[in-house]
UniProtKB/Swiss-Prot annotation:
Protein's name in the database: Small ribosomal subunit protein uS11
SUPFAM superfamilies for the chain: Translational machinery components (SSF53137)
Gene Ontology terms: biological process: translation
Keyword field contains Cell inner membrane: no
One Pfam family this sequence matches: Ribosomal_S11
Length: 130
């Protein structure tokens, strides 16, 4: 069988971005960390699933820590030093993801909770009976 041709697409140029925003979306099933510049352009991202966790383990605090470390490492390579942290969602990986960003060497200037709260909007799903 013939070998598939290797694609050599445009490589992303390393930019020097000193300030940015870390968006942490933490649900009960997964944690997604996106690090953007101040205008909102994504510089690096990672999730518990992308870090190698599957199934129920994606919702654990350790998976969130691993995802945050991976995203922070890539952001540090782009020259990022200071970040604001916006946390969204009720998941268990919120605090550990913030701590992992700090331990990785990023200076956190602000932590803001941006979890959306309905002003009595849509009807809630019925309660689970387990």
């Amino acid at each position: 069988m013939a070998k598939p041709a290797k694609k050599t697409g445009p490589k992303k140029a390393k930019r020097n971005v000193p300030n940015g925003v870390a968006h942490i979306q933490s649900t009960f099933n997964n944690t997604i960390v996106s690090i953007t510049d101040t205008s909102g352009e994504v510089i690096s991202w990672s999730s518990a699933g992308a870090s190698g966790f599957k199934g129920a383990r994606k919702g654990t605090p350790f998976a969130a820590q691993t995802a945050a470390e991976a995203a922070a490492r890539r952001a540090l390579d782009q020259g990022m030093r200071q970040i604001e942290v916006l946390v969204k969602g009720p998941g268990s990986g919120r605090e550990t993801a913030i701590r992992a960003l700090q331990v990785a060497g990023l200076e956190i200037t602000l932590i803001r909770d941006v979890t959306p709260l309905p002003h009595n909007g849509c009807r809630r799903p019925k309660r689970r009976r387990v």
